[in-house]
Amino acid sequence: MTALPRYAVFGNPVAHSKSPQIHQQFALQEGVDIEYERICADIGGFAQAVSTFFETGGCGANVTVPFKQEAFHLADEHSERALAAGAVNTLIPLKNGKLRGDNTDGIGLTNDITQVKNIAIEGKTILLLGAGGAVRGVIPVLKEHRPARIVIANRTRAKAEELAQLFGIEAVPMADVNGGFDIIINGTSGGLNGQIPDIPPDIFQNCALAYDMVYGCAAKPFLDFARQSGAKKTADGLGMLVGQAAASYALWRGFTPDIRPVIEYMKAL
């Protein structure tokens, strides 16, 4: 009996990850059987865990917090997106035994916004809240969609300035943000605990979409605040999660899943 193709997500913690359910839905669409597991790597033991996984027949891996930067350094080759992001969330084994690193977070976000939420990014003004790895990972792909303007706001201005210079966008201190944004995306680490960034409510008055990169209960405080402050549409990061997973799956298997039914399936769980 042939062993099933094996995939995994590496993180710490990782028990909460929804990646196994998502990838099993993709496999159903493709009409194949796969194995997809969660691997909690020790801090300091990530490289060894990845090496063991691929040496024992692993066919592809996702990488989540806190290992995305380490995965970048572990990869032998990088996609342009991964190079721009300085982080890797997808590892692809090559025939020569090397590992290629890619970053599908940006595609996950933009596909959810443009294809599922049906909101164009081209020509729009975008405000990014936060300047950590999650935000850095999506800027290169947002720029490919040719928005009129991207502004990054962060509690510590220096970090926002650093990203602004790197990507040729604008930076403002969180307290100085004022209105006129079509799309507002929350990527602050406070979002994970349901903390709302320190921003004035009037910035949401002409906002077509307020988006939180986290999903579920953690996104609720920010999205409620955005809705009450005038945002026309709000969305949590579930679609981004499914979208980045679909892009990873396509890199491993050459099959591009339809994310819409999988987003609906995950919402119903």
Curated annotation (Swiss-Prot):
Keywords, ordered alphabetically: Amino-acid biosynthesis, Aromatic amino acid biosynthesis, NADP, Oxidoreductase
A single GO BP: amino acid biosynthetic process
Entry-linked Gene3D superfamilies: Leucine Dehydrogenase, chain A, domain 1 (3.40.50.10860), NAD(P)-binding Rossmann-like Domain (3.40.50.720)
Catalytic activity, as annotated: shikimate + NADP(+) = 3-dehydroshikimate + NADPH + H(+)
Biochemical pathway: Metabolic intermediate biosynthesis; chorismate biosynthesis; chorismate from D-erythrose 4-phosphate and phosphoenolpyruvate: step 4/7
Keyword Amino-acid biosynthesis in annotation: yes
One GO location term (cellular component): cytosol
InterPro entries tied to this protein: Aminoacid_DH-like_N_sf (IPR046346), NAD(P)-bd_dom_sf (IPR036291), SDH_C (IPR041121), Shikimate_DH (IPR011342), Shikimate_DH-bd_N (IPR013708), Shikimate_DH_fam (IPR022893), Shikm_DH/Glu-tRNA_Rdtase (IPR006151)
Positions of NADP(+) binding: E80, G130, A131, G132, G133, A134, N154, R155, T156, R157, A158, K159, M213, G237
Signal peptide region: none
Example GO molecular function: shikimate 3-dehydrogenase (NADP+) activity
Binding site for shikimate: S17, K18, S19, T64, N89, D105, Y215
Active-site residue numbers: K68 (proton acceptor)
Stored NCBIfam families: aroE (TIGR00507), PRK00258.1-2 (NF001310)
Family of the protein in this entry: Belongs to the shikimate dehydrogenase family.
Subunit structure, as described in the record: Homodimer.
Function summary: Involved in the biosynthesis of the chorismate, which leads to the biosynthesis of aromatic amino acids. Catalyzes the reversible NADPH linked reduction of 3-dehydroshikimate (DHSA) to yield shikimate (SA).
Official protein name in the record: Shikimate dehydrogenase (NADP(+))
Gene assigned in the entry: aroE
